[in-house]
Amino acid sequence: MNKFFKTLSLLAVIAFFATACIPPVVDVAQAAPAAAGYQTMLGRSVSDQAVADFIANNNCTQTGSFQICQPAGLALWTDADQIVKTAYLYLSNSEGFTAYNGALPLGLLRNDTMASVEQKLGQPRDVHALPGPWEPGLPDEGSSPDHIHYWAVYKRFGVTVIYNTPAANDKNATIYAILVSK
């Protein structure tokens, strides 16, 4: 699990440095619309036609294991076999990224607070439920690897919600970004 957070932290660092060193030159009027959503690309090779078209249409740039798609508001992480494993969705204009404007996973909305996310993703505590009892709405794991954002990991959904606060108890915090993994 520690390796997972190191990878996610690396993504944040790469995105920061990639955008800090390059002036944001994104004309919103000329930004190509996302022809395919992140759901289409998860689990597919970057050489797959739908993924390759998305990368080309959105002027994505490869940085290590990442396809940085600033005009589309997302970054794609690929494994050693070039399979898209994670989509990092930016919900606001930040770090040179345009806000992702596609549908968010699990009925989440871009203006949801931590409290509303926990309500939407919550499961009633039931000791007989499989794969096990969960506290209502609480993430399976949480941390603040960059000491700026709180990362709430919902393993059962393959989703990590990143908030604009390092505090796990700031129920008014809004969503900064969402990672969706396959």
Model-identified regions with their sequence ranges:
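Bacterial N-terminal signal peptides that target proteins for export
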Residues: 1-9
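Secretory targeting and sorting signals
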Residues: 9-16
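C-terminal motif of bacterial Sec signal peptides marking the signal peptidase cleavage site
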Residues: 18-20
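Bacterial signal peptide processing site
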Residues: 22-24
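Phosphate/dinucleotide-binding and metal-coordinating scaffold of catalytic cores
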Residues: 27
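A cross-family detector of function-defining hotspots
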Residues: 31, 40-93, 104, 108-182
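Nucleic-acid endo/exonuclease domains
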Residues: 34
